[in-house]
Amino acid sequence: MSLTGLPDIRKKIGQFHHLRIYKQILSLQGNFARLNYFLGDVFPANLRSASVSVFFEVRLGPRIPDCIVLLKSVDAKDEFAFHCYFFEFKTTLGKSTMQSVHHNCIHQAQYLQGLRQLHQSISFLDQYLIADEVLWNVVPVICFFRQWGLKLDFFKKFSGKTKRLSFSFICDLFARSQDGAVQSLLSIPNYTNFRRACQKHTDLYRRRYQKASKSVLTKTSGENRSRASRQVAKNAPKNRIRRTAKKDAKRQ
């Protein structure tokens, strides 16, 4: 099954929950332990003191990975100067597992789409390889979150790719290739305003408003019809009603 066959509303709900995940990552960026726990403990312990940079929805050629977490290692024994994690997030209504990925057609389609996204995004960096630059460890990760409560059901961390890249150039590339609309949403400090803005961004707010308006209109039109019926009965000629009643009585 292709994800293009999903109802439009399901895609919009998925986009909305992606934004919630991004906001949570930003709130945990300064706390390595909590950020690592939220993402499935994918970062090794020796990166606990590393500086962390986060990028969202970075356009890399034909692909846009959901999130890139870049950690600058301060461990003298670490062969890599930088550890770069490419994340692809999938959200589901029910619980997802590796078994459901094999048997649930939607979960399977999400998983395969995520793999293609990660592979092509990381391969895009190959055009920027520089022989005498520092070593990077580029790691692809796919995470399945339950939409209710943003619970991480399961994740898959794949083997890292070793690349020699320029830190300043790649950081600049990531920063300027982010989605501007997403950055504006994530900059909203108040959570209630953020949630409402996300609903508007994904068109969910408009749908909810239209649904509510339709309900109100239906109720109002029903009330108007009832009022009109009562008014007709009220305005009916009373003499005519009485004469009709007398005729019926004589016939009996």
From Swiss-Prot:
Locations listed in the record: Virion; Host cytoplasm; Host nucleus, Host nucleolus; Host Golgi apparatus
Reported induction: Expressed late in the infection cycle.
GO cellular component, one term: host cell nucleolus
Organism: Human herpesvirus 6B (strain Z29) (HHV-6 variant B)
Compositional bias (Basic residues): 237-252
Biological function: May participate in nuclear egress of viral particles. Plays a role in the dispersal of several host nucleolar proteins including NCL/nucleolin and NPM1. Since deletion of host NCL/nucleolin negatively impact on nuclear egress, UL24 supposedly acts on this process through its effect on host nucleoli.
Domain of life of the native organism: Viruses
Protein name: Protein UL24 homolog
Gene coding for it: U49
